[in-house]
Regions:
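N-terminal hydrophobic targeting/anchoring segments and the immediately downstream early-domain regions
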Residues: 1-24, 141-157, 162
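Histidine/acidic residue-rich metal-binding segments in metalloenzymes
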Residues: 14-120, 124-140
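Active-site-proximal loop/turn and secondary-structure-junction residues that shape catalytic pockets
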Residues: 67-71, 91-93, 121-122, 169, ...
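Hydrophobic/aromatic-rich, well-ordered segments within soluble, folded domains that form packed cores
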Residues: 80, 84, 88-91, 307-320, ...
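Short linear, low-complexity motifs centered on an aromatic residue
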Residues: 96-111, 131, 229, 236-238, ...
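Short, intrinsically disordered, low-complexity segments enriched in Ser/Thr and Pro
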Residues: 107-141, 251, 374-376, 501-510, ...
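C-terminal amphipathic alpha-helical interaction region
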Residues: 518, 524-729
């Protein structure tokens, strides 16, 4: 294995940037070329079929079979101009990845001749085997049938020689087995609820759209070094490895010059993204060595999520052409920053108003304040649900590690906006406002744009931060499907807005003016949610104590956090807003618990194998060298000199032996704990046992191995070290 390490380093020394041939035309000329967008639809579809698609996208109007056949034929004819041979229903099962089954256009015609055909039936619905995808026990293995159904709101696209059609994925009995189905329901719920609130201010608002701008962080590691690390290959993270003498302490990597090989990779990735209509805009070095970030322009949440899933797949494919491997694990390297996926979320009306952006009028700013205050209450009431949406085996290593937001949910507004809310509360008393008081309040609210223009600070330690015209949810992990958190945020916001509107309607029906009712409910909501507002250092120990005093939860136990999907408030949101039914919610919880269990199980098995079959034998080899050295020294020195000169080596032999014994004992105990956990009856019991009884051994074993790495001759150490993984370009 040590030979593999040094062969990898030799191979890496000869790496050169891969040349990327950029098109000679302007970006606008090839942007979206591989997407069946509205422009292509107009060109390849009959006018009645084009209108049917647009009505389906904008109004949800069903597409009949005749129109579906026209659309499918036009889609196929467009795809054939790119020499496409196959099509697939592209969907997002509960695996944090995408799935596809490729079928050819080939069919037999009536006369037995081979033809190429793509029908509306094949476009709209397919039947992939659902038995091998995560389903949380709501389907038996022998009940294999599942359906994929075309999501008309997300355009088809071409990857390699395959036409990819975004779809939802449901069971034979109609239960959602994917991320897209509940995401579309959550977006529909927030659209309806937000529109109702907006129409209190502007009756012209017909729809509200949720937008998302994700920021994808990742590491790049040379493929030769990656292949020499079985833990990276099998778990996505290093289960052992002592920190490098230099890591990120000089802050010299963040926004630094991008290495040439990485630039070539980024160029090709951007090129392929632009062909697929993915509006990637920003690229830069991140904080940790060999860590980078990619970010696009904001889009509709559903499309943005599809694009993020596609980007993660593209990154892996393109990286291999540049002799890199992309690491999307949240914490691939101990001691340096992990990777997240910041979700920048906003709500916009069909009249062009960003509901999280201050307006130019007092009335517009009342709308702004209304939505800001409802976000505060949404997060306050649903802390546990938001945490459940982002917690995982990988992300638990990152959250609260002085590099990422803590497991405590809070909102950062900036002190000026926070002060403005306090001022609103102070001005609103229980008595009816006089005209002068209303005018003073409106003048104060009218100053919001001027106040925020230069005073919207940033707080990188906040998990949910207002950043001027959006909220940035920073707790999501880099490998996660954005839909997991977007489902929860939009569903919870819909639930909160519905409750807010119900409170106002009740007061109005009781005889109160709508404006007075709005002021009253706003004041009550600001006061009720004030504990969720925090402007300080989210990494500090003081904040943990303060959060506890405020009644904010801090759950670091992964299975316990997952089970919060099923508490009373979470059920009120997820089932109450019809995002999930009982079976679907049970399925999500079981799938997340099983995912966690299996990931820890795999890590445990891999570490046990590496410890016993790679590290311990290496330690014994070095120990034998030391013993041979001691025997040689004993032959040439007197007893007194020998004792004096060899004390350090004898201590080292003893140290190595003690660590070997400790590793073997810990691996044995970990294996026994795993056996016990595997025989427990329920998925909840298994997950709790893996968290509490198995997982602690990973750190214990690692600690011994990392000490041995510093003590054993570098020449025989079998695995690439952190200095090689993080600093070789």
């Amino acid at each position: 294995m040590s030979k593999m390490r040094f062969f990898a380093l030799q191979e890496l020394a000869n790496r050169r940037p891969v040349k990327v041939d950029y098109p000679s035309e302007k970006l606008a000329d090839y942007y979206g070329n591989h997407v069946f967008d509205r422009k292509k639809m107009q060109e390849y579809l009959p006018s009645e079929a084009y209108k049917a698609v647009i009505n389906a996208i904008e109004k949800g109007t069903p597409i009949n079979r005749e129109m579906a056949d026209m659309i499918a034929n036009g889609m196929k004819n467009w795809a054939k101009t790119f020499n496409v041979t196959h099509y697939t229903h592209w969907f997002q099962p509960l695996t944090d990845g995408t799935a596809e089954k490729h079928d050819g256009f080939i069919e037999f015609g009536e006369d037995g001749e081979v033809i190429e055909r793509f029908s509306g039936k094949l476009l709209i619905q397919q039947e992939p085997d659902a038995s091998s995808f995560p389903n949380g026990g709501i389907r038996n293995t022998f009940e294999a049938r599942g359906y994929t159904a075309w999501d008309v709101s997300s355009p088809a696209f071409i990857v390699d020689s395959t036409l990819c059609i975004p779809t939802i994925f449901i069971s034979y009995t109609g239960e959602a087995l994917d991320y897209k189905t509940p995401l579309l329901k959550a977006l529909g719920a927030v659209d309806k609820a937000a529109t109702e609130v907006c129409r209190m201010f502007d009756p012209n608002v017909k729809r509200v759209f949720a937008n998302l701008g994700w920021e994808q962080e990742y590491f790049l590691v040379d493929t030769a070094l990656y292949n020499a690390r079985p833990d990276l290959c099998l778990t996505g993270r290093t289960l052992m490895g002592h920190s490098s003498a230099k890591d990120q302490q000089l802050d010299d990597h963040y926004f630094g010059s991008i290495p040439p090989r990485v630039t070539s990779f980024m160029k090709e990735l951007e090129l392929e993204c632009h062909k697929l209509g993915i509006p990637v805009k920003t690229r830069h070095n991140e904080v940790a060595p060999n860590q980078f970030e990619l970010a696009p322009i904001f889009e509709d949440v559903n499309l943005a999520n599809d694009h993020n899933q596609l980007v993660m797949d593209l990154m892996k494919r393109i990286a291999s052409k540049h002799n890199f491997t992309v690491l999307l694990h949240e914490k691939p390297f101990k001691g340096v920053n992990g990777s997240g996926k910041h979700n920048n979320w906003s709500l916009c009306t069909d009249t062009g108003i960003n509901l999280f952006s201050p307006a130019k009028t007092a009335e517009g700013n009342m709308l702004f304040l209304t939505f800001i205050v409802n976000v505060l209450m949404m997060v306050y009431k649903n802390q546990d649900l938001l945490r459940a949406s982002i917690v995982s085996a990988g992300n638990s290593h990152r959250l609260g590690a002085n590099e990422a937001p803590p497991a405590i949910l809070s909102i950062f507004l900036g002190r000026h906006l926070s002060h403005m809310l306090d001022e609103v509360v102070a001005r609103l008393n229980d008595a009816e406002l006089t005209p002068d008081e209303k005018k003073a309040l409106q003048l104060g609210i009218g100053r919001i744009p001027a106040i925020l223009q230069d005073n919207t600070d940033r707080n990188r330690t906040s998990p949910f931060a207002f950043t001027g015209n959006r909220f940035e949810f920073r707790a999501a992990g880099s490998s996660a499907n954005c839909a997991a958190s977007m489902i929860v945020i939009n569903a919870a916001m819909a639930h909160q807005l519905n409750e807010f509107k119900t409170q106002i309607d009740k007061l109005v029906n009781g005889g109160m003016e709508q404006e007075e009712a709005l002021y009253k409910v706003l004041k009550e909501t600001i006061i009720a949610s004030q504990n969720i507002r925090f402007e300080g250092d989210g990494y500090s120990e003081e904040w943990k104590a303060e959060a506890a005093r405020r009644g904010l939860t801090n759950i670091c136990h992964v299975p316990e956090a997952i089970l919060k999907f099923n508490d009373e408030q979470s059920r009120a949101v997820l089932i109450g807003e019809k995002i999930f039914n009982e079976n679907e919610l049970f399925c999500r919880i079981e799938v997340e618990l099983e995912k966690f269990t299996k990931k820890v199980q795999i890590e445990s098995r891999v570490l046990g194998d590496l410890a016993i079959n790679h590290i311990v034998p290496t330690a014994v080899i070095y120990q034998n060298r030391l013993l041979e050295n001691l025997r040689g020294l004993k032959e040439i020195f007197s007893t007194e000199e020998y004792e004096e000169l060899t004390e350090d080596r004898k201590n080292l032999v003893r140290e190595i032996q003690n660590r070997i014994l400790a590793i073997k004992k810990a691996v044995h105990n970990m294996t026994e704990a795993r056996k016990v956990a595997n025989h427990l009856g329920s998925q909840v019991e298994k997950a709790f046992s893996y968290e509490e009884q198995v997982r602690p051994y990973l750190e214990e074993i690692r600690d011994h191995i990392d000490h041995l790495e510093l003590e054993i001759d570098d020449e025989i150490w079998p695995l690439p070290k952190y200095r090689e993984l993080l600093f070789t370009k």
